[in-house]
Curated annotation (Swiss-Prot):
InterPro entries per the UniProt record, alphabetical: Class_I_gatase-like, GATASE, Imidazole-glycPsynth_HisH
Domain of life: Bacteria
Gene that specifies this protein: hisH
Cross-referenced Pfam families: GATase
Keyword Cytoplasm part of the UniProt annotation: yes
Protein known as: Imidazole glycerol phosphate synthase subunit HisH
Gene3D superfamilies documented for this protein: 3.40.50.880
């Protein structure tokens, strides 16, 4: 009698550089079927099969913590070498050239463009806090299987504008359209909190897992 081999859960390296909700992210990644290794040692990055970059707080402080931990160069090298990378919340914003939150502070520059701040308006509170819809654009593997009624949970004042060179992901409207999730080659990201977004967040993380271990 033949047996079907059990596929091992793909491993991801979750970066703990002092500016992200690592514990919640780790639990969510594990629920989505991944083996999670948490590290505060940048020397682990070159050996990682996949990277997850969380982030919360002020862009300057997050970027300074990232650089102080020695992650800047190794993560750039890994991303440019094609290692799958998932940025979450401010971890998504770090992929770009910089942010209006911290003029003059460079991001990783893996995708061209500047992160912008929501302008205050009578119909819009800043930060955006709560649920909002995801509208799929192009063919992002992160969004596969999600229907037109997909909602995710956001807490943010800064956003990635739709005029950056991205074609695949999800766009959300908060008085201005912005990329709420994206895929570009080996780079993937979500501005919302997958761990707080219920079945939609879990599905997005499971889709990232499938990119690491396709059937």
């Amino acid at each position: 009698m033949s047996t079907t081999p059990v596929r091992a859960a793909p491993e991801v390296l979750l970066l703990d550089y002092g500016a992200g909700n690592v514990r919640s992210a780790a639990r969510a990644l594990e629920r989505a079927g991944m083996t999670v290794r948490v590290t505060d040692n940048a020397a682990d990055v070159p050996h990682a099969p996949a990277l997850v970059v969380p982030g919360q707080g002020h862009f300057r402080q997050v970027m300074e913590a990232f650089e102080h931990g020695g992650f800047h160069g190794p993560v750039l090298d890994a991303a440019r070498a094609g290692v799958p990378l998932l940025g979450i919340c401010v971890g998504m914003q770090l992929l770009f050239d910089g942010s209006e939150e911290a003029p003059g502070v460079p991001g990783l520059g893996l995708i061209a463009g500047q992160v912008r701040k929501f302008a205050p308006a009578p119909e819009r509170k800043v930060p955006q806090m709560g649920w909002n819809a995801l509208e799929a654009r192009g063919d992002s593997p992160l969004l596969r299987g999600l229907g037109p009624d997909a909602y995710a949970y956001f807490v943010h004042s800064y956003y990635v504008p739709v005029d950056v060179p991205v074609t695949d992901g999800a766009v959300t409207d908060y008085g201005v359209p912005f990329w709420s999730a994206l895929s570009r080659g080996n780079l993937h990201a979500a501005q919302f909190h997958p761990e707080k977004s219920g079945a939609v967040g879990l599905a997005l993380l499971a889709n990232f897992r499938r990119e690491l271990a396709p059937a």
